[in-house]
Amino acid sequence: MYTLADAAGWYFLAPLFGAVAAVGFLFIIVILEALVLRGLKWGSLKLSFVDSAVINLTSGFVGALLFAFSAPLVNQGTAFLLLVFGALTVLIEGGMLTLLQRHPARQTWTAAIAINVVSYAFLFVVVVGILRL
């Protein structure tokens, strides 16, 4: 079972905790990223939340597809996987934010990097700090 939360959530959290935790993790990530978007003056809190939900569902879906075909990556270690999935998530979510055409490219890609630094820092704390994976 896999989660719908960023590309890395598919690998790290769902196999351990199941669907309920997966949905909870998605909700936490959407809220964290919406707050970062709001802090970056992306738009209203509602718009930031909607955009965060859209991009996270998209990156989660794409992450699941990529993960299904990336068996050789599984044995590379936690840090490597966080780096790979983090980079993919920035590209996917930055691309989605670009397609929404709400802001200039520089602001869009700054937002994509910032929201993922926050969400992957959270994921790192959960996976490495708490779960010790």
What are these regions (language model features)?
Residues M1-L133:
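Juxtamembrane/disordered regions of integral membrane proteins
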